[in-house]
Structure formats: structure tokens, C-alpha cells
Amino acid sequence: MARAAISDRDDVALVVATDDEDIAAHAREAGCPAVMTDSALATGSGRALAAALLFAEGPRFVVNLQGDSPFQPEGALGAVLAALESGAEVATPVIALDWESLDALREHKLLSPFSGTTCVRAPNGRALWFSKAILPAIRDEDRLRATDGLSPVWRHVGLYGYQLEALRRFEACAPTMLER
């Protein structure tokens, strides 16, 4: 997915950042450079920043694809890069769930409650809140199902893009009580 999304760009480097030698070896076997990062890093964003800082000339943008979310909607990576290039400091795509996908997410959460992240958005599309709970609560769901093909639930796809300085600021912040 990542290779296809950047195939026409010579200004983008694809690098796997991991603290697991097996993952690094697999990436290298697949022809992708890999860098080892400190296992004490708590987040993928921290790992992505550590990898970016290994390069003599730091990148303008850093994109972090969660290792547990390798399958992305077509165009997601390109959209993140386009948002960053047009001035966004942070870009992270979400997709509107149709009712069947929402039902599947609900079923999956019965077995794995902390999997999958949903997003509540402002009318302008800006993310207001991310949650492991399915948000928003849906009133009069039967009526909505009958009239709308899409549910009001947006799912985060596990892709984060940052201007390098925005990522530095983000990683300098301590986790909040709600993140723990």
C-alpha cells in the first residue's frame, strides 16, 4: 500500500521503525529499509519521530502507519500527504461506516473491546474526540438505517501524518489521564 501510494514521488522515503528485530528483518527481506528504535517508546508516533530524527536532514513530514492497521483505504496515504503539503500540521483520516461495517465493529468489540477507534467530528470535518468506545451514541437508529446508507460513526484507520515540528511538540507532551 505504501509503496503504491508513493511510487510516483521521489521526495518520499519509506522506512519501517520498530523495536522488534524480526519485524525489521522481515521489512528488509521485503526490500524496505528498517530502523531499530528504543523499546521504551510508548507510541508509534514516538517511534516514527525517533526514526525521522536518525536522518541527517530531517523530513518535512512524518507519516506513521500503525503496524496493526496495515490495510488502508485506497488513497488514504496520498490524502494525508496532500493535506500536509497544503499546510495541515496534522492529518489523520477517518472513514464513515456503513451500517454493515458498524454492525461488524460492534461484534468485533464484544471480543476485543479496545480494538478499533471511532472519531467524533465537527461539521467542518475537524476531529473533536477519538474513542475506543463507539461514538457518537445513535438516537433513533432504525429510522436512520431506513433513510441513510451511512451511519454517523467514523472509524479511524490507523494512519497519522505530521509536520515534523508538530510531531516534536506532540511527543513532548505527557499523556493525559484519559490516554492512560
What is the meaning of each model-derived region?
Residues M1-T18:
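N-terminal glycine-rich phosphate-binding loop and ensuing alpha1 helix
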Residues D11, E57-P59, S86-V90:
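Short, high-confidence coil segments that cap the C-terminus of an alpha-helix
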Residues L14-V16, V62, A127:
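Hydrophobic/aromatic residues located in beta-strands of well-ordered beta-sheets
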Residues V16-D19, T43, R180:
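Short secondary-structure boundary/capping elements
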Residues E21-A82:
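Short phosphate-binding loop-to-helix
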Residues Q72-C173:
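Conserved core of the sugar-phosphate nucleotidyltransferase
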Residues A174-R180:
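Donor nucleotide-sugar recognition loop
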